[in-house]
Amino acid sequence: MSLQTELNELMSRKGYSQTQVARAFGKSTAVVNQYLQGKYKGDVGSIDELARSFIAREADKEKSRRITPRYIPTVTSRKGSEVIRLAHLDGEINVIYGAAGLGKTMILREYASQHRDALLIEADPGYTARVVLEELCGLLGLSKRGNMHELSEACIAALRDSGRLLMVDEAENLPYRALETLRRIHDKAGIGVVLAGMPRLIINLKGKRGEYQQLFSRVGLALNIGESLPQGDISDIAVSMLPDAEKPDVGEALFRASNGNARRLFKLVRGVSRHSDISGNAVSAGAVRKFAEMLIN
């Protein structure tokens, strides 16, 4: 079977377009089109190599189990969900904070997926008070035109007495003015607000010298999920992705190598699972430890 035929069959089976293949090759769509038809007049050998590599890579992907992170009910995630639920029911501002990679985002996304009256904003370092208002307007189906006061008033009018919940992930990225904007919306509209982020979120809410009393005094509950997850949580998450993690030695190796971090655990599980699928060897504690040596974080 020619490489062109193999590539055509792969594209048909996977539903890949010539544009997608061209992007993977780093070539133009015209080159891929001509190559597939056997009409390419350039360096056919170099395109053959690209095709071979692409086909082999796709074959490796097919061998590998598709492992994706998903929400798993654990002791920590249940605590987080309860703090969110209380903010929703009581119209309070609650906070969830802790180290990166412990599942805060997953908890918020799960709550949003289960409650259609919950709004989720995922902030980044470029977020200003105006960006927060524009994002909220987008979620509420409101116009993003107008000055900040007009946008704020529009959001308050849409949310007042609605019983809705506003959640902001990575809220440590928000400057003081953005946090104050959220406080004002909470006060005026009477909705619950959940802020989730790294530990410095608490400092941002209090102020370095405790000068933001008006803001921090609004916080009802603040859940600190710490620097790492307990072994039971790591075990539950690991087994949900990799049945071999039920073996005591493999489970123990994953916990130790993950440092109690769910994000690092996912990288470990994906790596050892892929190696197992491709090599044909069973997942072992030794394989976990060996792969862990290659992880930077």
Where are these regions (language model features)?
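Conserved AAA+ ATPase "SRH/arginine-finger" region at the nucleotide-binding site
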Residues: I121-P125, N204-R209, G220-G232
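Walker A/P-loop nucleotide-binding motif
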Residues: H88-E110, D124-P125
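Post-Walker A helix-loop "phosphate-sensing" segment adjacent to the P-loop in P-loop NTPases
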Residues: S113-I121, G141-S143
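C-terminal alpha-helical "lid" subdomain
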Residues: M1-A30, Q34-E49, S53, Q214, ...
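Conserved adenine-nucleotide phosphate-binding loops and their immediately adjacent elements
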Residues: D60-P73
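Sensor-1/coupling segment of RecA-like P-loop NTPase cores
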Residues: V95-A100, I185-Q213
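Mid-core helix/loop region of P-loop NTP-binding domains shared across ATPases and GTPases
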Residues: T128-A129, E134, S143-D187, G192, ...
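Pre-Walker A adenine-sensing motif
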Residues: Y71-H88
